[in-house]
């Protein structure tokens, strides 16, 4: 949404746009859960938005101040976005939120604490996009979350140290499928919803269907 507007969430016009959008979606799907992912911009994208006040100098687009890292580093932006979802939640109890680009359980707990301080009482979930989050999954599952979504494009990139569309970016490899099975089993034991998301091809989707894993397509 912020990319589409080319505006930082600090701007009132951006806040109103996101609020109206979420209100509309929550009303259209009033009988279903609606999951809103907090802003997940690369540093270059965030630096170029109208209204951005915090600028970070980074050379690699995939690393650094993305997702939850930027939220915690820029509390004004975090508060502004949280205020929007909290306001929408008051009249749309089917709204839930999910944190992207999470390092580990400790970082996730920090973000959830801030979220609760601003009176959001709905469900919370997390993306698993980093190997560090995969290795810390046991503790992540104890943070009170209700949903896990594995970001397949980023996780595969970081596991194989490659970029999407390269010959080494193979999300159907036995390594990635084993990781998914392990995460699925752990989430199931804790009764936490589990899904995968990304730019997914037909072959991968078929494998997920066979494993009983929900797919969210970009």
Where are each of the predicted segments found?
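Conserved alpha/beta-domain cores
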Residues: 1-218
């Amino acid at each position: 949404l912020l990319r589409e507007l080319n505006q930082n969430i600090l701007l009132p016009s951006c806040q109103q746009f996101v609020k109206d959008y979420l209100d509309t979606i929550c009303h259209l799907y009033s009988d279903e859960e609606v999951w809103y992912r907090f802003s997940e911009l690369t540093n270059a994208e965030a630096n170029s938005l109208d209204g951005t006040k915090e600028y970070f100098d980074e050379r690699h687009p995939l690393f650094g101040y993305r997702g939850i890292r930027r939220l915690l580093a820029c509390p004004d932006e975090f508060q502004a976005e949280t205020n929007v979802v909290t306001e929408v939640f008051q009249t749309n109890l089917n709204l839930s939120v999910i944190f992207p680009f999470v390092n580990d359980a400790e970082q996730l707990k920090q973000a959830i604490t801030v979220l609760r301080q601003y009176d959001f009482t709905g469900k919370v979930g997390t993306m698993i996009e980093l190997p560090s989050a995969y290795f810390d999954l046991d503790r992540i599952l104890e943070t009170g979350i209700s949903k896990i979504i594995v970001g397949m494009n980023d996780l595969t990139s970081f596991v194989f140290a490659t970029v999407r569309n390269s010959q080494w970016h193979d999300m159907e490899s036995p390594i990635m499928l084993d990781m998914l099975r392990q995460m699925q089993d752990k989430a199931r034991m804790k009764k936490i919803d589990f899904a995968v998301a990304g730019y997914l091809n037909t072959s991968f989707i078929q494998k997920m269907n066979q494993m009983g894993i929900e797919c969210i397509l970009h």
